[in-house]
């Protein structure tokens, strides 16, 4: 309020005072009126300084708590076996992404662009697990979306805005937290367009979805209804800025290795791609995928604009038998450790022989399900035992060997020393 502004009662001679510092309107440049209170320009500046200092302290605290790439890699190593190249790429990309968010609070002419990530690897190689572990490490909201369920707006299926809706649900509709979250879009290869040439007809679940995802991934303000969908047109929409949300897209991209080999062959055999003689060689296929270029992804069926918004590409190798055996035993939440914990709750020790672990790995390789199929195999083998065990007494140990995995025998049950009256048949 200016100095010559009349009082609320209409008495122009009444002197007004700041409700916070007590200075009169004659001692300050400006006095702003509110409902029964006044605040001067000096108090407004002081409030701004306090808020600015708190933001800087919060930024410094976040920076100190942000794990370094080596620390990120160490945590990933605890949960994901192998895939060192992909883990290093992810560690650096995630670290740079959150450094970029912190840099927004500084007065700098250089604006850092967002680097979303594309994970390319066979099914069951650890793509989803990598994304989940990163989100858990960074303590940020995380959601998984299935690209095959997405369609263009106006068609039956999920709109791309539903992805942000799921992210909001994960953090109880805290918009600020959601704007720093991680979104993993699975099966991204399934929305590739049907041919390399632009479609002249509607492809609502392929190229159309890629077009719809462009702005969301790059950064836009999405209007999301709190209760989802468009069933409540009268409700107030939440405005979520996606420019600081990290998008990780993953897919198996079956056949991409052949596209890469064809490019290398047409180029006169330059590079390691020409060394691949058979697509059945798992190691060689992994090496071929490591040489993926944007043009290969475009030829596979992703539109150029979409590929351009996923500048960081990490490729995963197909898992061999030794890697699958390690996955069964080494990670913090390894499958065998989980089942041993379940049996411990019944006061029974569970033992997996080495030949059993190898048999499980071979079975998963034969089914071509990767690490994802390991749990199914172990679950089926132990199903009858887990059904009977709670009702039985005196069992101290259950042993699983190769013959059990091959369904040639039941798990071996080792009993404790029976009480005398039980042994006598009473």
From Swiss-Prot:
Pfam families hit by this protein: AAA_2, ClpB_D2-small, zf-C4_ClpX
Any one biological process term the GO annotation gives: cell division
Superkingdom in the source lineage: Bacteria
SUPFAM superfamilies: Glucocorticoid receptor-like (DNA-binding domain) (SSF57716), P-loop containing nucleoside triphosphate hydrolases (SSF52540)
Molecular function as annotated in GO: ATP binding; ATP hydrolysis activity; ATP-dependent protein folding chaperone; protein dimerization activity; unfolded protein binding; zinc ion binding
Keywords, alphabetical: ATP-binding, Chaperone, Metal-binding, Nucleotide-binding, Zinc
Binding site for ATP: 122-129
Domain ClpX-type ZB: 6-59
Entry keyword annotation includes Nucleotide-binding: yes
This protein's GO CC annotations: HslUV protease complex
Binding residue positions for Zn(2+): 18, 21, 40, 43
PANTHER family: ATP-DEPENDENT CLP PROTEASE ATP-BINDING SUBUNIT CLPX-LIKE, MITOCHONDRIAL, ATP-DEPENDENT CLP PROTEASE ATP-BINDING SUBUNIT CLPX-LIKE, MITOCHONDRIAL-RELATED
Family indicated by similarity: Belongs to the ClpX chaperone family.
HAMAP family: ClpX (MF_00175)
Subunit structure: Component of the ClpX-ClpP complex. Forms a hexameric ring that, in the presence of ATP, binds to fourteen ClpP subunits assembled into a disk-like structure with a central cavity, resembling the structure of eukaryotic proteasomes.
Protein's job: ATP-dependent specificity component of the Clp protease. It directs the protease to specific substrates. Can perform chaperone functions in the absence of ClpP.
Name under which the protein is recorded: ATP-dependent Clp protease ATP-binding subunit ClpX
Organism in which the protein naturally occurs: Xylella fastidiosa (strain 9a5c)
């Amino acid at each position: 309020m200016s100095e010559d502004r009349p009082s609320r009662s209409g008495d122009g001679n009444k002197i007004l005072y700041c409700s916070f510092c007590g200075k009169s309107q004659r001692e300050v440049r400006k006095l702003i009126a509110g409902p029964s209170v006044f605040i001067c320009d000096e108090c407004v500046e002081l409030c701004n300084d306090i808020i600015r200092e708190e933001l800087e302290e919060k930024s410094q605290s976040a920076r100190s708590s942000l794990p370094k790439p080596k620390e990120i890699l160490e945590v990933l190593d605890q949960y994901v076996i192998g895939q060192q190249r992909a883990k290093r790429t992810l560690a650096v990309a995630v670290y740079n992404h959150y450094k970029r968010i912190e840099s927004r609070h500084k007065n700098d002419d250089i604006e850092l662009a967002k680097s979303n990530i594309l994970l390319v690897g066979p099914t069951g190689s650890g793509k989803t697990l990598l994304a989940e572990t990163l989100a858990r490490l960074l303590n940020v909201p995380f959601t998984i979306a299935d690209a095959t369920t997405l369609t263009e707006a106006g068609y039956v299926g999920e709109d791309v805005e539903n992805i942000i809706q799921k992210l909001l649900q994960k953090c109880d509709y805290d918009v600020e937290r959601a704007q720093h979250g991680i979104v993993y879009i699975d099966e991204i290869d399934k929305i590739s367009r049907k041919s390399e040439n632009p479609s002249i007809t509607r492809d609502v679940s392929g190229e159309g979805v890629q077009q719809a995802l462009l702005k969301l991934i790059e950064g836009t303000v999405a209007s999301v209804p709190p209760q989802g969908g468009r069933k409540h047109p009268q409700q107030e929409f939440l405005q979520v800025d996606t420019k600081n949300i990290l998008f990780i897209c993953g897919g198996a991209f079956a056949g991409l290795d052949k596209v890469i080999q064809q490019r290398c062959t047409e180029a006169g055999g330059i590079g390691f791609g020409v060394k691949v003689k058979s697509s059945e060689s798992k190691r060689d296929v992994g090496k071929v995928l490591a040489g993926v270029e944007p043009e290969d992804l475009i030829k596979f069926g992703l539109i150029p604009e979409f590929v351009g918004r996923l500048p960081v590409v990490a490729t995963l190798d197909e898992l061999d038998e030794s890697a699958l055996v390690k996955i069964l035993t080494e990670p913090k939440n390894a499958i065998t450790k989980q089942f041993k914990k379940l049996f411990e709750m019944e006061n029974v020790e569970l033992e997996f022989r080495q030949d059993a672990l190898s048999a499980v790995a071979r079975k998963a390789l034969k089914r071509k399900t990767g690490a994802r199929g390991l749990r199914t195999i172990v679950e089926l083998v132990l199903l009858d035992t887990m059904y009977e065990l709670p009702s039985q007494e005196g069992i101290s140990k259950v042993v699983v060997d190769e013959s059990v995995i091959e369904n040639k025998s039941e798990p071996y049950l080792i009993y404790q020393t029976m009480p005398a009256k039980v042994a006598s048949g009473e």
